[in-house]
Amino acid sequence: MPTVTEKTIKLDKAAIKALDISHLAEQSLNKNDWLTAGQSEYRLYAWLSTQFINTTILDVGTRTGGSALALSYNEKNNVISYDLVEQGASSGIKKDNVEFKIQDFREDDTLDFDNISIIMLDVDPHDGVQEEEMFEWLEEKGWKGLVLLDDIGPQWPEIEDFWNRITYPKLNVTEVGHMSGTGLVNFDEKQTISWL
């Protein structure tokens, strides 16, 4: 499976915190969720989308579509958002570079994993079991890219435990992510991720 040629992503806290995502918040089903970086993850997600061009980004755990909207910030990328149950996003959010699917992403035979750079995981019931199964599935597939993992803080001890056991290079990006804890995991040895 092809990998990204040597790429370095330097997370710029100031740029993430200053990013204007108000146009996305206006389309959101939950406008009150679009808080500052460190309270809400959406500025981080939007900023990360600018680090890739002409790629596919997966949002696993649609709920009301906020993450999908944030990840769609860079309109040169396509976002596919997955959930097992419709919760209003597919009828309430209309954006050309966002597609909503009701299915397990692992069962989507149309995906080209060579062109997927970011996968965001935020699935219920936040027990760490599904997240670990998804990581193992991605490992078996030989996928290369970044995983965003939400709720890695002490409020969700099972996910925090899973986070602590991850052996891939990782960064706790809660400072510019969601207050419940946000982690960034690097599945690609040809790219490095660090703070600016």
What are the language-model segments listed below?
Residues 1-196:
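A short alpha-helical cap/connector motif
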